[in-house]
């Protein structure tokens, strides 16, 4: 149901644990994902896009990871918006610990945390499932900085498989952190410029 409205996708998780409530299906939602070890440019773009989406009343979905994910969610809060963190660990576990301030702010400002377990530390096997939940909850995905092989592109692939739009923010052609964005499958996806317009 919430993971995908298309009945052809049957690989749903056993259960979701939610601290609060799930995103409102009657309100637009978008995911912002990208590199953990992002550049200052990527971080500023994530903050800017997150703030614009939050200000526009769009629910921002992400994984509360360091780097792009966390910056996009901080931006949403700065825009007086609502953001939801999908965690690859217990819903009551803050990971990474450095984002404890963001973890608390999300709850204070009306957002919530969604986990695939309770009281579990993050495990590598949890993150592909976490990425799929992110794409399932969002209507479209924005990728800001991603290497050629990254979890962010896994999220983008899930979204494309679900028939959703994927947008990638271009960066310097010499940057390894932008290579994944430049090579994002153009089928159902597009590039976006700094004004938020798309060419896809």
How does the language model describe each region?
Residues 1-200:
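Glycine-biased, small-residue-rich flexible motifs in mid-sequence functional cores and linkers
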């Amino acid at each position: 149901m919430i993971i995908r409205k298309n009945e052809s996708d049957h690989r749903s998780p056993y259960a979701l644990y939610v601290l609060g409530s799930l995103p409102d299906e009657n309100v637009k939602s978008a995911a912002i994902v990208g590199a953990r070890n992002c550049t200052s440019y990527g971080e500023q773009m994530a903050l800017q896009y997150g703030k614009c989406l939050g200000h526009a009343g769009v629910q921002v979905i992400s994984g509360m990871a360091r780097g792009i994910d966390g910056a996009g969610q901080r931006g949403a809060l700065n825009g007086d918006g609502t953001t939801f963190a999908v965690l690859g660990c217990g819903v009551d576990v803050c990971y990474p610990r450095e984002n404890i301030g963001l973890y608390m702010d999300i709850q204070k400002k009306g957002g919530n945390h969604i986990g695939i377990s309770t009281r579990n530390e993050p495990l590598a096997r949890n993150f592909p499932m976490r990425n799929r939940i992110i794409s399932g909850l969002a209507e479209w995905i924005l990728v800001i900085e991603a290497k050629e092989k990254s979890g962010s592109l896994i999220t983008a692939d899930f979204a494309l498989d679900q028939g959703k739009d994927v947008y990638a923010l271009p960066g310097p052609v010499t940057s390894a952190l932008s290579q994944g964005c430049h090579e994002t499958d153009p089928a159902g996806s597009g590039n976006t410029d700094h004004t938020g317009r798309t060419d896809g």
